[in-house]
Structures are given as C-alpha cells and as structure tokens.
C-alpha cells in the first residue's frame, strides 16, 4: 500500500472520528445537569411523589403528557404552553383537552428549580424526568433520562390534531404513524402498554358501544360482559362530558402487563388497543408481553428513552422558559 493511500485513509478516519465526536457532543446526555443543577432530577421526582400522593392519576397523566409532547414538534415542552387570545395552543386541542393532566406538577417543579438554578433546567426535560418518575412510582422500571432538551417557542392546537393517533386507528395506521416518528412496530406495541394505567373519557370509545362503524350496535370484538360494564358507566345519550373509566380496571394505578392481558381477553378499551390482535406480528408481541412482565418493563423503559429523543432542540436552539406556560419575551 502506497504512503499516499495510507495518508488518505488516515485522514478519512480522522474526519469520521471528528464527525462522530461532534454528533455525540450534540446529543442529549445522562447527567446533563450534574454540575449546573445537581438537584434537578431529585426536585422533579419529589414533586411527582407529592402529586401522586394527592392524586394517583397524576402519574399516568404525566406519562401521557410526555408522549403528547414528543409526538408534536418533538420533545420541546410545547404541550405546556398556554393559549393566548391570538393562538390556541396544543393543550387546548380536542386531543388534549380536557384529558391531559399533571400540569400543576410541572409548574411546581419548575418553580423550585428556578429558585435554586435560575434559567438552567428546561421545561422539556422536566416533562421527560416526570414521565420516568411516574413510571417508576407506579411499579415500572426506572431508567436514565438523557437530558439537554431546549424549549420550543411554538404551540399550535392544529398540530396536535394531526400528530397524535386517535383511538380509532387500525394496526396498519398505528404502525405507519409510529414509523413516521422513527419508532418500530414493536416499539408501538410496547408503548401502547402505557394504557395499563390511567383513564379515558367515555367519548373516546363510545362509538364501540353504541354506534360501531355507523351501525346501532356495539363492536363485535368487544367482550360482551366488559361492554355491559362500560355501558353502565357511560350511558347512551349522556351529556356529562366528565364521565371517565379506568383503562385497565383490575390495576389502574400499577404499571404492569394487565393491558396486554385485557387485550387478549377482548377487553382493550380503544379500537387502537384491540386492533393489535388483528395482525399476526403484533398479536404475537401482545402475547409475549402479557407472559413476560419483566421483559416488557425493560422494553418499555428503552422505548420511552428513544421516544424522549424525538425532534429535540439542543445547543442554542429554542430557549429555557422561565415559566413553562409562557414563551420568554
């Protein structure tokens, strides 16, 4: 091999190494606030704990908040921004209002962090930390959260409607939707397991009870006994928009594989839950998750980390909001 070729190859490897180094430096990092705000993750965890004691529903709310944040414009905290007279923000989209909850936990954590580390910890990172802590406090596995996200300046209700999968989606639609976000079909099935905690408003699934596919009947794939119970809790023609039911009646506050067990019993609450059995591959994944709790919890933690890195703002992009509800002036 000639000396010129050796030199060329050496330079090529140097350039590759430098490019990789720059890319790695630009990514999120575990322990990002270790020196700039060492108590950051502890403070968020403490606020999640206090919120959970007041209302256990806060935990599933915060997990869902992280998902809804990341799928719209990336994980930039835009779901936290309040609407103004001139703009309807994400949180007031029908996909989020009135179902999203846990905002007060984020507010409390941010207020404490601003008191000890002014202008350091982003709202987007607080949401990511709070989601992790919510998984852990409900019995899931804790996991390291790479941080360093910056906060976005734009929040549009219209974007929430087009970037969040509705509860009526089929397995093919879900697979494509998650693929568009860079997530695999297996990760879609894994993250769907978040429905093992929390609640749903009756309006999100009432079509399965009273008007399935434009008929006057109920969804034939829905377990009859479960359907009867749901009809009791969600009477036909009710004008009460606050009626809710647990996603997983047997253990609504525990992060376990109850969701997958329910789906196998034809007790998935949403069409988008039960549809997982209509595809050979996803049905196999449902059965595997139902029978391997520890495996699913590990997969769920990994999928949450990956989801938490969607479309993030880093470096000098975005801002660090002083108030998570308001864009800095």
From Swiss-Prot:
One GO CC term, this protein: extracellular region
Binding site for Ca(2+) 2: 196, 251, 256
Keyword entries, A-Z: Calcium, Disulfide bond, Glycoprotein, Heme, Hydrogen peroxide, Iron, Metal-binding, Oxidoreductase, Peroxidase, Pyrrolidone carboxylic acid, Secreted, Signal
Binding site for heme b: 195
PROSITE patterns cross-referenced by the UniProt entry: PEROXIDASE_1 (PS00435), PEROXIDASE_2 (PS00436), PEROXIDASE_4 (PS50873)
Site residues, Transition state stabilizer: 64
GO molecular function: heme binding; lactoperoxidase activity; metal ion binding
Binding site for Ca(2+) 1: 69, 72, 74, 76, 78
Active site positions: 68 (proton acceptor)
EC number: 1.11.1.7
Signal peptide location: 1-26
Record keyword Acetylation present: no
CDD domains assigned: secretory_peroxidase (cd00693)
Modified residues (Pyrrolidone carboxylic acid): 27
Example of a GO biological process term: response to oxidative stress
Cellular localisation: Secreted
Residues bearing attached sugar chains per UniProt: 213
Cofactor(s), names only, from the UniProt record: heme b; Ca(2+)
Disulfide-bond pairs as recorded: 37-117, 70-75, 123-324, 202-234
Annotated positions binding substrate: 165
Summary of the function given for this chain in its UniProt record: Removal of H(2)O(2), oxidation of toxic reductants, biosynthesis and degradation of lignin, suberization, auxin catabolism, response to environmental stresses such as wounding, pathogen attack and oxidative stress. These functions might be dependent on each isozyme/isoform in each plant tissue.
Record protein name field: Peroxidase 5
Organism: Vitis vinifera
